[in-house]
Amino acid sequence: CYSPVQYRVAYNLNPLYKRGITGAGKTIVIVDSFGSPTIANDLHVFDQQWGFADPELQVMKFGNVPPFDPNDPTMVGWAQETTLDVEYAHAIAPGAKIVLAETPVAEVEGTSGFPEMMAAEKSLIDRGIGDVITQSFGATENTFPGFDNGNFSSLLNLRFAFKDALAHKVTVLASSGDDGATNAMSDASTLFPFPVNSWPSSDPLVTSIGGTQLHLDNSGNR
């Protein structure tokens, strides 16, 4: 586990910061199911730990987001994901404003959670909020209803936010998944025994961001 300071060295970000390229004047939209009730304080503690200035953070709820239940493992998992997403978006682009969009339904395999997420994204785009949308989530295409039979309507019907982003020149990113060339089945734990794609990273209007495995020497270099 590396610190944000180590990431800045490993990915040669410090020369960008010296040139004034920090994300200042731009807004990063982060979309997560449920969000985290402690995100503002968590981010502040993170910034104090690493010597960063607090960014402008705006939390927006879309739909009837339920109260946080610390005994709900799904909510706890999303709170952890939210914290990771927000803290490291800020660490890499310290000058950018961050908008956290919280949605009311958990995104899992298949279409669950996606309609609410896409509606939130379109709402923000239509209001001119966000230069970049980052989506650290995804579901295997094969878990969408009808996909294996050549019926892609359940997936295609969710693309409206991305078409809107294209029209408004908003960059949309998505993680490619956690398991290399495969991904989870509908049970969210068993992996497909053959190569599959994760959506929305597979969408042609989305930039897919693949995972990396970082190894540093004692000087912080790769």
What are these regions (language model features)?
Residues C1-G211:
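Substrate-binding/charge-relay-adjacent region of secreted/lumenal peptidase catalytic domains
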Residues V206, L216-R222:
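Predominantly extracellular beta-rich ligand-binding scaffolds that present long acidic/polar faces
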